Amino acid sequence: ATFSZAPPGBZKAGQKIFKLKCAQCHTVEKGAGHKQGPNLNGLFGRQSGTAAGYSYSAANKNMAVVWZZBTLYDYLLNPKKYIPGTKMVFPGLKKPQDRADLIAYLKESTA
């Protein structure tokens, strides 16, 4: 299923998911540093592997995907399948609602 078929995302629910599953490795605020994973500020419309100052895997750089709702929706289902060789150890979010919620939160928090 694609993002266009996903349920509407809930930003508040997405924030909870981010805190539980993503914040250990990622920040969203402008100017916040990289952690184990890159800072996600300005994520939408950015090509994978291009946040300045973060050491990406070759796989992430070479994938050259542009992050939008639809690409994030597919990626977050199974990151290792979407970008084989990625350093991201997160197994993914299987539930469409969880992915839609997280994307709604990221859309606001990284802008």
Swiss-Prot record:
Protein origin, superkingdom: Eukaryota
Post-translational modification remark: Binds 1 heme c group covalently per subunit.
One cellular component (GO) term of this entry: mitochondrial intermembrane space
Modified positions (Hydroxyproline) in chain numbering: P79
Keyword Chaperone found: no
Keyword terms, alphabetized: Acetylation, Electron transport, Heme, Hydroxylation, Iron, Metal-binding, Methylation, Mitochondrion, Respiratory chain, Transport
Modified residues (N6,N6,N6-trimethyllysine): K80, K94
PANTHER family associated with the record: CYTOCHROME C
Additional comment: There are amides at two of the three positions 5, 10, and 11 and at one of the three positions 68, 69, and 70.
Function: Electron carrier protein. The oxidized form of the cytochrome c heme group can accept an electron from the heme group of the cytochrome c1 subunit of cytochrome reductase. Cytochrome c then transfers this electron to the cytochrome oxidase complex, the final protein carrier in the mitochondrial electron-transport chain.
Designated name of the protein: Cytochrome c
Native species: Allium porrum (Leek)
